[in-house]
C-alpha cells in the first residue's frame, strides 16, 4: 500500500546532546534527546537512533548535521546516516545541513533582518568558536549567500577576521549557539539561539523541500547525499 504520509527524520547535534525528531506531514510528531557521552559507545548510539524510528516508517527525507561541532558526534551522525542509506533507505533523500547555516536562518527568522545585511554565524563547542559569514539577499528565510569558509577563531580576534572581509562588529548582525553566551556580550546586534527553536528551522526546510519551494541556488546551502563532515578544523578525538 502506498504511504500517504510524508515523513522526515531530523538528526541534529554539535555537542554531547543529540536531538532526534520525526516530522509527519510538516508537523512535529515526536522528539528525543540524549547525551552521547553518558554511554560513550557507538553501538549504543546506533541502537538509540534506530529504536526511535519504527521499522514500518517510510522516510521521505533525512536531515542530518554535517558539522561543525564536536568530532565524536559529527562522526557518529555521518556513520549512522551512511548505514541508513545503504541498508534500509536507498530511496530516501538524505540532506546534510551546515549547523552555521541553520543558526543564520534562525537569526533571519527571529529578527526579520533587512535584505543585504551581513550575518556572522558563531557556533561554540568546548574551546572552539566556528564562524561563517552570510549575506541576506532577498525577503526569503533561506536566501542567504555564503561569503566565507568555516573558520575556527578566537573571539578576541574576531574584528581582525571581519576586517579581511571589509566588515566589522558594528556593521554585522551576529548569532550565537553555544554554552557560554556571556563571551559574546560585547558584540553589537547579537542574537543568542534558543536551541529549542532549531527544529522549527529544519521543519521549515523540510516543508519547503517537500513542496518544491526552494530554488536550485538556495539549495546549494544544503549538502545532499555527500555525507561529508564539516569539522572546521583538523580532526582529533573530542
Place the predicted regions along the sequence by residue.
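Oxyanion-binding and handling regions
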Residues: 1-31, 37-38, 95-238
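Short, well-ordered alpha-helices that flank and scaffold nucleotide-derived cofactor binding pockets
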Residues: 51, 82, 86, 109
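DPxDG-like acidic metal-binding loop motif
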Residues: 61-99
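Short amphipathic alpha-helical face segments that pack within enzyme cores
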Residues: 44-47, 79, 83, 102-105
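Phosphate/pyrophosphate-binding loops at sites that engage ATP/ADP/AMP, CoA/4′-phosphopantetheine
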Residues: 48-61, 158-170
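N-terminal phosphate-binding loop and adjacent alpha-helix
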Residues: 34-51
Amino acid at each position: 500500500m502506498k504511504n500517504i504520509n510524508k515523513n522526515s527524520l531530523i538528526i541534529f547535534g554539535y555537542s554531547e546532546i543529540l536531538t532526534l525528531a520525526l516530522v509527519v506531514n510538516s508537523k512535529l510528531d515526536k522528539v528525543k534527546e540524549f547525551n552521547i557521552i553518558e554511554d560513550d559507545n557507538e553501538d549504543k548510539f546506533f541502537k538509540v537512533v534506530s529504536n526511535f524510528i519504527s521499522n514500518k516508517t517510510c522516510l521521505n527525507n533525512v536531515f542530518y548535521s554535517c558539522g561543525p561541532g564536536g568530532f565524536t558526534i559529527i562522526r557518529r551522525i555521518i556513520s549512522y546516516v551512511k548505514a541508513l542509506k545503504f541498508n534500509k533507505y536507498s530511496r530516501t533523500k538524505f540532506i546534510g545541513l551546515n549547523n552555521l547555516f541553520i543558526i543564520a536562518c534562525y537569526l533571519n527568522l527571529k529578527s526579520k533582518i533587512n535584505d543585504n545585511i551581513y550575518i556572522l554565524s558563531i557556533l561554540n563547542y568546548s574551546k572552539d568558536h566556528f564562524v561563517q559569514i552570510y549575506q541576506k539577499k532577498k525577503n526569503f528565510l533561506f536566501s542567504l549567500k555564503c561569503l566565507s569558509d568555516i573558520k575556527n577563531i578566537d573571539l578576541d580576534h574576531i574584528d581582525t577576521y571581519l576586517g579581511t572581509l571589509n566588515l566589522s562588529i558594528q556593521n554585522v548582525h551576529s548569532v550565537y549557539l553555544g554554552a557560554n553566551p556571556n563571551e559574546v556580550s560585547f558584540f553589537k546586534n547579537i542574537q543568542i539561539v534558543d536551541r529549542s527553536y532549531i527544529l522549527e528551522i529544519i521543519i521549515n526546510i523540510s516543508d519547503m523541500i517537500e513542496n518544491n519551494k526552494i530554488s536550485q541556488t538556495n539549495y546549494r546551502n544544503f549538502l545532499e547525499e555527500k555525507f561529508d563532515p564539516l569539522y572546521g578544523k583538523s580532526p582529533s578525538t573530542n
